[in-house]
Amino acid sequence: MDPGCAYSTNLAATVVESVKAGKSKAETFAALDSSKWAHLQEPKLLDDAVQIPVAGAPSIGPPNAKITIVEFSDFQCPYCAIAIGEINALLRAYPTQIKLIFKQFPLETHPQADLAAAAAIAAHKQGKFWPMHDAMFAHRNDLSRKSIMLLAKQNGLNMDRFEADIDSTEVRETVVRDVQDGEHAHVEGTPTLFIGGQRYNGQVTLASLKPIIDGELAGAQTGTRNKAGN
């Protein structure tokens, strides 16, 4: 159980409430399909659009994309790892219409996530963010300093520069700013997505995200989409 991951937090709350109410195992499982869990699964955008600073953050997709998705993520979060394939499928489905921006949000419950976040930013300074992103998620159960250095070497980073950058004040402050940006946007767990500046509520799957994207694209054409300037 990971208290910082968005989905597990909601699941745990449902289970705890069922146990407190003295419900049986069968009733508890049934509760997971009830209103609260169904609400979590219902894909929609919440709240008004917010401004999230993204200058200098790693991104993928065309700079003039109609839709910007900002992802707050943690390299040791199991749900973030699962979401990678779904987000990649979304980017393939909309190759000219979506830009994805990655923001660090290492959770306190993940002891190696903060170092991994610094490593990702250090790799970004050498134009190697996405290779390190993929490598660290693939090895998320061991993101010790030794493991991260090995992954960096395998991905062709300049190791002298990487080792200096990972411990630099500049990189550490970037991690802190990303976390603060997430907190200001009311990020409570990972992964958390903002689509056009609005917080996304729902499963991070292609099936759940596609209707949201289609709706945003339709809104962009008619000028009714809620804009945040991200």
Where are these regions (language model features)?
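All-alpha RGS (Regulator of G-protein Signaling) helical domain and cognate RGS-like helical scaffolds
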Residues: 37-54
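A short beta-strand-turn-helix
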Residues: 51-67, 92
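Loop/turn elements at helix/coil->beta-strand transitions in domains of secreted/extracellular proteins
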Residues: 25, 65-68, 95-99, 126-131, ...
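Short N-proximal segments of mature Sec-exported proteins
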Residues: 1-14
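C-terminal cap of thioredoxin/glutaredoxin-like
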Residues: 18, 38, 68-73, 79-91, ...
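Short, internal strand/loop/helix patches
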Residues: 120-142, 151, 156-163, 170
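Short, charged, surface-exposed loops that flank catalytic or proteolytic processing sites
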Residues: 17-28
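Conserved helix-turn-beta segment immediately C-terminal to the redox Cys motif
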Residues: 84-105
